[in-house]
Amino acid sequence: KPFPERFTKIAEWVANKPGYSFKHLEVNKLEAYAKDFAEIYNDAWQDFENFVPLQTKGILETFNKMKTVMDEKLIWFAYINNEPASVIVILPDANQMIKSFNGKLGLIEKLKFLYYRWKGVNRMRAVVMGTKKAFQKHGLESALFIKLKEYVLPLNQYVELELSWVGDFNDKMLSIHEATGATFGKRHATMRKLF
């Protein structure tokens, strides 16, 4: 379904502001994007309980492992005056690629994987999103969604985006989900046992 009109107007206004630029990840520049991701993530998430800073090396390793399922034009970065400001990482739903494998990975499954990788996936999953504190409430997240939409709609492939897990303590992300017109899908409960 289309984004609400107000959301779209704000996002387009932000996307065209002077000094603001938006780039999708480029596989041949993974190290630079891993560095930008670390800078954004560590700033955006530092005040959350049990936060552990991410290192560029670890992010680069993760990006390299994600290459088999990654569509580089689903991972977007926002920059303000060339400073990394915001990021959204979205992947094609790997479950759709491997669900028929029944735990096997032979030649037939590898061929199926290649087919599903390019033609058979119609769902995306947002893995992580973050904006540096200094740039929160600038509408960058909205603009990232618009940039994503500009790529995804002409493909006529993806029909659903799951915005993944967002803690009920994260009011900012919950408000972004609401602004996009997202519908609630699942509620997960996390429990811990205290000894």
What are these regions (language model features)?
Residues 24-131:
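A conserved beta-strand-loop-helix scaffold within acyl/acetyltransferase catalytic domains
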Residues 123-124, 152-167:
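Conserved GNAT acetyl-CoA-binding A-motif
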Residues 131-136, 162-173:
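Conserved beta-strand-loop-alpha-helix junction that forms the acyl-donor binding cleft
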Residues 176-187:
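Conserved acetyl-CoA-binding loop of GNAT-fold acetyltransferases
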Residues 123-131, 136-152, 179:
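Conserved acetyl-CoA-binding loop-helix of GNAT-fold acetyltransferases
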Residues 1, 93-98, 135, 170-171:
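Flexible glycine/acidic-rich beta-alpha junction loops that bind and position SAM and/or redox cofactors
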Residues 163, 187-189:
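Long, positively charged, glycine-interspersed low-complexity recognition regions
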Residues 1-24, 189-195:
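Acyl-donor-binding surface of acyltransferase catalytic domains
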